[in-house]
Amino acid sequence: TQVYDGLQNPLPKLAEQCGFFLERGVYLDPIPDKEWEFTPCVKPGDAVLAGDAVGSVPEGQFTHLIMAPFDLKDEGWRVKSVKEKGVYHVRSTVAVLENGAGEEKALSMVFSWPVKQPIRCYEERLRPDETLVTKIRCIDTFLPVAKGGTFCVPGPFGAGKTVLQHMEAKNADVDIVIVAACGERAGEVVEVLKEFPELTDPRTGRSLMERTIIICNTSSMPVAAREASVYTLSLIHI
């Protein structure tokens, strides 16, 4: 599933369960409830810190790292046990960490993190040092954008803000496209849902939708739900 609402509910599954009228308090797991292939990156006895890779899981053309919890407080944690390479359920325990006091933490292939809580266990903050090629002449020539940078497109109704967003999503030199369609943008995202599956990704030769994630919240949804899309987007891209 690659289309979500602001709370990261997968919209196709939400439609199957609720139909056209959303029920109060519905929340679905954004991670597919199935088995995945796990490959360990550590062995029993290895020391680990917050954010260290414990294993990896492939999904399509990408490889996800299974990391030690971001909130590990001290440096005394070690790998007590880890699963061998194989296929396991997404919620199954694949590794167990233990500190000097005997406290244990069981790790599965997924864990939750508050969307508004910053992640501080990084070694270095990378600064933008490479130009993002969008293949849109007016941007690449007159207003070049750095990879990891930010730019804004203001304008009145009909100025072409959404068209520019869609063109950039189709042509930009990036590994994955994440579109946060909040408000009016979500009403126009239907074009993306119809067009992207039919477009061929020049980098992989596969469907462009395979590396695209869309978060939809229309103007009729509460402001809080639309605001949540921004936080959800910022966490997904990590």
Predicted regions and their residues:
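Short, surface-exposed secondary-structure boundary micro-motifs
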Residues: Q8, A53, P58-G60, N99-G100, ...
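Conserved P-loop
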Residues: M167-M209
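Accessory, often N-terminal, substrate/partner-engagement and coupling regions
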Residues: T1-L49, A53-G55
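P-loop NTPase nucleotide-binding/switch module
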Residues: Q17-W36, I66-A68, S92, V96-G149, ...
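Residue-level marker of beta-strand positions
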Residues: Q2, G45-A47, A53-S56, V87-T93, ...
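Short beta-strand segments of a lipoyl-like beta-sandwich/carrier module
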Residues: P30-L49, H64-H89
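P-loop NTPase nucleotide-binding module
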Residues: I136-E184, S234
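Conserved small/polar residues in nucleotide/adenosyl-binding loops
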Residues: I236-I238
